[in-house]
Swiss-Prot record:
A divalent metal cation binds at residues 237, 239, 270. Bifunctional enzyme that catalyzes the formation of 4-diphosphocytidyl-2-C-methyl-D-erythritol from CTP and 2-C-methyl-D-erythritol 4-phosphate (MEP) (IspD), and catalyzes the conversion of 4-diphosphocytidyl-2-C-methyl-D-erythritol 2-phosphate (CDP-ME2P) to 2-C-methyl-D-erythritol 2,4-cyclodiphosphate (ME-CPP) with a corresponding release of cytidine 5-monophosphate (CMP) (IspF). In the N-terminal section; belongs to the IspD/TarI cytidylyltransferase family. IspD subfamily. In the C-terminal section; belongs to the IspF family. It comes from Anaeromyxobacter sp. (strain Fw109-5). The gene is ispDF. The keyword Transferase applies. This is Bifunctional enzyme IspD/IspF.
Length: 386
């Protein structure tokens, strides 16, 4: 990169989002707005010295707030009636910069490396854009009553799909806007204006993941990238033995003294419940079923699991599977493990094949080995459904 010229990144976020039916620049993806994600990639590029965010008139304050703290000087200015007006305003505002990068705020997945390559090509050649070679066969259509017909098959070897960022010497871009006049609004990108001057534009290999959010399907695609389709939680619980209480594990009653607790003290169900709540980011068992609440005194822990399954469903998850290990000298778990699996699965609304129960004796070590109580370790896998 030629470092004797400053580089400004212009983030075009002045659109109304009419095609998508939403204001794309403010849409939240994975905890951040689309605009901030797009800005983050630009300012992470070492070549970029400053950021100019172009937003709808009256929303400059919001636009600036979205890009604060990203490590580059930034300002927000008002856009115009058309994209060309907004980018022209941004280029004019980038005084003192020899190179400008223009990037769609609706492309939140561009990488800093791509921005650097486009900036370098623009500094060297005057104008450049990120683009992908066409891989599908392309047909040119002709109108016909009822449905269009194929007029010709184009040679895809000469066809590229334009992306952003697009980079320019600032003076060249402003000259292109001046020459186009009112016709600038008809151009679908800035490179078309430079091409109209007869100036060469260099193609820089783009990135397949650098797609533009234009409609609901694109929003769903972006969310599928940023929001993990599965989540995992870990649960752990212990209870000491207490005389005169029922011993319930996995919803199944065993012979012998039970465990001390506010509910039925089913340590197996409690560990599973904690794992499921943790995977959904919903805290722990004590938060939802505190031992200070008389509603849960003596209640079956299977009822708690039903409540937990409903809570995680409301949070957009379903239980994929869970695996629990009991550490206990007594009782013998293996003979009744299948019964426990069935009870737990019914409470969670899953099949027994999605629940696994196993046990260890602790080899005589610790409080488990001394026969003072039972411990349970559980892991749960949750599947995001929305």
């Amino acid at each position: 990169m030629i470092r004797d010229e400053r580089v400004a990144a212009i983030l075009a976020a002045g659109g109304s989002g009419v095609r998508a039916g939403l204001r794309k620049q403010w849409l939240e993806l994975g905890g951040e707005s689309v605009l901030r994600r797009a800005a983050r990639a630009l300012v992470a590029c070492d070549a970029v010295d400053e950021l100019v965010v172009v937003v709808p008139s009256g929303e400059e304050g919001r636009g600036l707030a979205e890009v604060e703290g990203l490590g580059r000087p930034a300002r927000a200015i008002a856009g115009g009636a058309a994209r060309a007006d907004s980018v022209r305003n941004g280029a004019r505002a980038a005084e003192g910069c020899g190179i400008v990068l223009v990037h769609d705020a609706a492309r939140p997945f561009a990488t800093p490396g791509l921005a650097a390559r486009v900036a370098e090509a623009a500094a060297r050649d005057g104008a450049a854009l990120a683009a992908l070679p066409v891989t599908d066969t392309v047909k040119r259509a002709a109108p016909r009553d009822g449905a269009p017909i194929v007029e010709a098959t184009l040679d895809r070897r000469a066809l590229w799909l334009a992306q952003t960022p697009q980079g320019f010497r600032r003076a060249l871009l402003l000259e292109a806007f001046e020459a186009a006049g009112d016709r600038a609004a008809e151009a679908t990108d800035e490179c078309a204006l430079v091409e109209a001057l007869g100036a060469p534009v260099t193609l820089v290999p783009g990135e397949p993941g650098n797609f533009k959010i234009t409609g609901p399907d694109d929003v769903a695609r972006a969310r599928s990238i940023l929001e993990a389709p599965v989540a995992m939680g870990v649960g752990y619980d212990t209870h000491r033995f207490a005389e005169g209480r029922r011993l319930v594990l996995g919803g199944v009653e065993f012979e012998g003294d039970g465990l001390l607790g506010h509910s039925d003290a089913d340590v197996c169900a409690h560990a599973i419940g904690d794992a499921i709540l943790g995977g959904a980011g919903l805290g722990d068992l004590g938060r939802h079923f505190p031992d200070t609440d008389p509603r849960w005194k003596g209640v079956s822990s299977l009822a708690l699991l039903r409540e937990i399954a409903a809570k995680v469903a409301a949070a957009g998850f379903r239980v994929g599977n869970c695996d629990v290990t009991l550490a206990a000298r007594r009782p013998k778990i293996a003979p009744r493990a299948e019964e426990m699996r069935a009870r737990l699965a019914e409470a969670l609304g899953v099949t027994p094949g999605q629940v696994n129960v196993k046990a260890t004796t602790g080899e005589g070590m610790g409080f488990v080995g001394r026969g003072e109580g039972i411990a349970a370790h559980a892991v749960a896998l949750l599947v995001r459904v929305r």
